[in-house]
């Protein structure tokens, strides 16, 4: 059985990156929650 986590910087950024978050309404909601919480890093 293979390991499920096969790291890829591009895939990571495209699915969880800042621009990916900004692209949808729910993604923007995620960012605003993280800002409200005071996260140092909003997105990958």
From Swiss-Prot:
Pfam families noted in UniProt? Ribosomal_L34
MF (Gene Ontology)? structural constituent of ribosome
Provide the species name: Pseudomonas syringae pv. tomato (strain ATCC BAA-871 / DC3000)
Query: Which keywords accompany this UniProt record?
Result: Ribonucleoprotein, Ribosomal protein
Gene Ontology terms: biological process? translation
Protein name as it appears in the record:
Large ribosomal subunit protein bL34
Coiled coil region boundaries: none
Does the record bear Metal-binding in its keywords?
Answer: no
> Mind telling me which HAMAP family this protein's record contains?
Ribosomal_bL34
Q: Which family does this protein fall into?
A: Belongs to the bacterial ribosomal protein bL34 family.
* CC per GO annotation: ribonucleoprotein complex; ribosome
**Gene encoding this chain?**
rpmH
